[in-house]
């Protein structure tokens, strides 16, 4: 009798708090996490991009953290770029609130972005997002406050998770290539957990000659390194091959 092989996450469990309307982050993260590392998700309410909607996602932060803690993950990630980069202090506040709700180590997408940029020794960032203009500008302000120069890029004016998921990867690729031709940078950051960008990383790195990072990629990389896992999944860019100590990734 043939027995079906099921991956029960015997190496590590990563918990993630995600926007309720996001249908892209889970498949992309699962594609990047190596065998034996499981992803366990709780959703927090968010489908749009207004300031009120973004901040309302945090109203159930503690409840979501406690629910995920029941599954005993090794770490819990708050995985929303627009919320965690809303202001320079936001990621720290999110982690602090999660820490009061559960002793399980917490991280946020914003933490992963900064860790990735540091690991790649980048100072000049080309930023391409699907966001509406206010969200895009807040992310520029956050990167600037974090010590990086945003040399250029642009946004696509999309407001909802559902619309973001429908953006053709080819449209994202073409926008990146057009912006990169005008704006030299050390790294290209394709921001947002809700767009289909993971498959663009390797071909864009080949075309641009610089590292390309995405919100889902940096979260997978940062979480794995925080968990002491040094696997390098193929096809997801230079970041995974970048030497970094677990201390540096913390």
Task: Show the residue positions of the predicted features.
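N-terminal glycine-rich anion-binding loop in soluble enzyme alpha/beta folds
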Residues: 1-63, 134-168
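Glycine/small-residue-rich loop that forms an oxyanion/phosphate-binding "nest" at active or ligand-binding sites
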Residues: 65-111
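Hydrophobic alpha-helical
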Residues: 174, 178-207, 219-220
């Amino acid at each position: 009798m043939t027995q079906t092989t099921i991956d029960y996450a015997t190496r590590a469990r990563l918990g993630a708090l995600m926007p309720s309307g996001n249908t892209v982050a889970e498949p992309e993260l699962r594609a990047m996490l190596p065998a034996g590392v499981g992803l366990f998700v709780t959703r927090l309410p968010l489908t749009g991009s207004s300031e009120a909607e973004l901040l309302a996602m945090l109203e159930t932060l503690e409840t979501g953290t406690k629910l995920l803690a029941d599954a005993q993950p090794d770490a819990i990630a708050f995985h929303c770029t627009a919320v965690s980069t809303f202001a320079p202090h936001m990621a720290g506040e999110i982690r602090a609130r999660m820490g009061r709700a559960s002793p399980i180590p917490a991280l946020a997408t914003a933490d992963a972005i900064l860790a990735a940029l540091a690991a790649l020794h980048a100072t000049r960032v080309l930023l391409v997002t699907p966001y509406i203009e206010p969200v895009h500008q807040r992310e520029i302000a956050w990167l600037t406050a974090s010590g990086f120069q945003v040399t250029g890029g642009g946004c696509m004016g999309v407001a909802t998770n559902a619309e973001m998921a429908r953006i053709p990867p080819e449209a994202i690729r073409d926008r990146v290539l057009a912006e990169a031709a005008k704006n030299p940078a050390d790294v290209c950051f394709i921001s947002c957990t809700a767009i289909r960008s993971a498959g663009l990383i390797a071909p864009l790195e080949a075309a641009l000659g610089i590292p390309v990072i995405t919100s889902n990629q940096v979260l997978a990389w940062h979480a794995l390194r925080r968990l002491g896992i040094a696997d390098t999944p193929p096809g997801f860019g230079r970041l995974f091959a970048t030497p970094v100590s677990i201390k540096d990734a913390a």
